[in-house]
Design a protein with these regions (language model features):
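An acidic-aromatic
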Residues: 78-131
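N-terminal leader/targeting segments and the immediate start of mature chains
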Residues: 1-65, 123, 253, 258-272
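Low-complexity, intrinsically disordered segments exposed to solvent
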Residues: 37-41, 56-58, 64-70, 80, ...
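C-terminal low-complexity, charged extensions that often adopt amphipathic alpha-helices
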Residues: 115-156, 257, 266-272
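Edge/loop elements at the starts and ends of beta-strands within beta-rich repeat scaffolds
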Residues: 43-51, 62-65, 72-74, 93-95, ...
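Amphipathic hydrophobic-ligand
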Residues: 65-68, 88-95, 171, 196-201
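Hydrophobic lipid-interacting interfaces of membrane-associated proteins
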Residues: 56-60, 86-88, 102-103, 107, ...
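Gly/Pro-enriched, hydrophobic low-complexity segments
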Residues: 5, 145-260
Length: 272
């Protein structure tokens, strides 16, 4: 990673290519510590090719629903989540960098949308979404935060620090993440905001060590868009995960199924 680190002696901010103003001020000792935590976070991540693991998805608001299944991810390429009821595959969620699908095998209908539209026309990639779901630090539209060319590091409090993207970058949103001050820092939250009334927060807990580095076993998600809100929780069975087995995903658009609209999908999920 090619970067330029510049910071005043009394600032807790590290400026990496492009961010000019510090956003917090503390002593030089904490500044140095935060720099060290940033590089420790970078070092803790590891490359991975694929993972297959159990998942439990709970929709908590505005209505409640819980279902379990298994997820398969191929790094930077695909996500496949098979939701099962009494051992039978009842629904499928699939996404790649081009498209996203929700397939209801019981009622025989499906929803399809471009991945970019589903992400709100932001620059998020399928790899970014994988990191969001696993609790790994990343830079929207790029790879890890260690590959981002314009970020700011800042002091959150005595026990946490953060990474903020360049507000002038063409990403269509603000983003930031908070990490711990542990010897091996872990990401505790990632947030996105388009405005004061439009924000998404991902809160991570039960972080465990894996071949990909630290991964969150529990992901709490809160979405706010104007006067509407939604919340959900993902639980991964990290201990049962199988990493780097060259797992293949063979998803095909359903034949003979009825296609449904976004409004119909939201009604199905109890969000309208």
């Amino acid at each position: 990673m090619q970067e330029t680190l510049t910071f005043p002696a009394d600032s807790a901010v590290v400026i990496i290519e492009g961010v000019e103003e510090p956003i917090d001020t503390v002593g030089a000792e904490q500044t140095s510590e935060i720099i060290g935590k940033y590089f420790a976070l970078c070092d803790s991540d590891a490359d991975w090719h694929d993972v297959h693991l159990p998942i439990n998805l709970s929709l908590q608001a505005p209505d409640g629903m819980s279902i379990s299944g298994r997820a398969t991810m191929v790094r930077n390429e695909e996500i496949y989540i098979s939701m099962r009821v009494m051992g039978f595959e009842a629904a499928v969620i699939y996404a790649n960098n081009d498209s996203a699908y929700f397939v209801d095998k019981y009622h025989k209908y499906y929803f399809a949308e471009s991945f970019k539209a589903l992400m709100g026309s932001s620059c998020l990639t399928i790899g970014n979404l994988q990191d969001l779901l696993l609790g790994r630090a990343f830079a929207p539209g790029q790879g890890t935060v260690c590959e981002e060319s314009a970020i700011t590091l800042f002091a959150e409090d005595d026990n946490a620090w953060g990474i903020e993207g360049d507000p002038e970058s063409p990403q269509g949103m603000e983003w930031w993440c908070i990490a711990t001050m542990d010897d091996v820092p872990v990401v505790s939250s990632v947030s996105f905001a388009r405005s004061e009334t439009s924000q998404a927060d991902f809160i991570y807990s039960d972080v465990q060590t894996t071949p990909a580095g630290p991964v969150a076993g529990i992901v709490d998600i809160a979405l706010i868009d104007g006067f509407k809100g939604a919340s959900a929780q993902l639980k991964w069975s990290i201990k049962d995960a199988k990493w780097n087995t060259d797992k293949q995903i063979n998803f095909k658009q359903p034949n003979g199924y009825k296609i449904i609209t976004t409004d119909q999908l939201l009604r199905f999920l109890g969000q309208s």
